[in-house]
Amino acid sequence: MPEQTLRDHLVAFGLSEKEADAYLVVLRSGQSTTSEVAQAADISQGYVYELASELVERGLITLDESTTPTRLRARSPEEALGTFSERLDQLSDELDQLYRRAEPGDPAIELVHSRSTVRKRIARTVDRAQDEVVATLPASEFTHLRTALAEARDRGVTIYLQLVSPLEKLPADIDWDSHGTVVKTWDATPPVTVVADERAGVMGAHSILSGRHDSAYALVFSQPDIAGAFFGNTVSNFWPMGELRHVATPDPLPATYDHIRTAVTNAALHRAAGRSLRADVTIRQVGSEETSTYEDVAVVDVRQHLVGEPTNEFPIENSLVFDTPDGPIAAGGNDGSLQPFYEGYAAVSVTLVDGIVES
């Protein structure tokens, strides 16, 4: 088996990438000093002691501190695998008990420590997105995620992408339009946050994907209330701090949307280009399932701050205001966890139409 494949398997079993590197150094030689491990795995000698403690706890090595220098000795594969097998059997029993107690449809929440697993969960989140992705990620992760982002854009997913420190890791000559609707950069280290369709995603410390992540964990979730909270935190506190790198051309008109935040973003881009807008809109009052439809009404205001100059009154406000025969009506989104609580109306469907070009 190639060593890289073995390393991947070890990471899949819960070892960090550095733990796997250190263990393979010891495994190859049978025993190694801390300095030998540090040199071969390209890590500091002080960090080797920390990794060694983890590997001892996992039952993979023994630590002989009676010698000078301290020696790390690999346990036989039979002993090491026996430890893994015992833990897997115990885990299987515990999972089975939890599964039998759980009610159908319980939200999935997962704590992940492995960097490679976090990357896989983020890619899965983007792969499953139907309408929208909001992501704050270290710039070094763009290479790992660029295929998933490009495929999501091809599916028509709106992507708000903020890439943060280390910005020097960004590849040159990126076709931003193929990977994001609105792209920003920010030389800071906010938490990693990826939310899809305001229903599922991943959130963790910046260090889980950049530099040494030590004891950092990421939360993987598929509960709308949790997704909405992380979405609101990201767009309120971190998104405004970024420097704009790219904005996609708005959708050609007429365009119909059932995901209203996408309609709001496109409306903002059209108005920034000097176009007035009219719309056919179906709305429902909050707390009611009955809908009303207005045809060929003017869009008199766009309230948002995801693209261009902010026009909202509070961070998560995202709505269109229509001049209807019943007076001005502000309508927010109809899906996700952030249901309209300010506007009073939710837009079920909106068709934007080009109005008279403003002078």
Q: For the regions a protein language model found, what residue spans apply to each?
A:
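N-terminal accessory interaction module
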Residues: T262-E358
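Primarily the HKD phosphodiesterase
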Residues: A129-W176, G287-D301
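Surface loops and adjacent helix of pleckstrin homology
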Residues: S66, R75, P138, V164, ...
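Basic, Lys/Arg-rich alpha-helical nucleic-acid-recognition elements, primarily the DNA-binding modules
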Residues: M1-G82
